[in-house]
Amino acid sequence: RFSKNWHPHQIAIVDDMQVLLAKIKGEFVWHQHEDEDELFHVIKGTLEMHFKDKVEIVSEGEIIVVPKGVAHCPITKDGEEVHVLLFEKLSTAHTGNVKHENTVSNYPKI
């Protein structure tokens, strides 16, 4: 239904939480969410979540939670397109404290 990378689509709302579906490829932007945790569930491919002091590899079927206030940068390797579900509060800004060319203000709904 959509082809643009780093452009999540909202697929559900549960109370004050939203579920987003995104295709990602390459490197995103370093950012953090001051007041919200963010959960990534990899449904296709392998995601590298870069933190200031480490890199976590998240394989298909696995999840990672990025705690609020923690700088992070999701990356995919070797041109791989990765599909993820994101679980976060409705108040969560896409690129947190950073404005970037990939920043999305309003998520399209599927």
What are these regions (language model features)?
Residues 23-24, 33-51, 87-89:
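Short, conserved beta-strand element in jelly-roll/cupin
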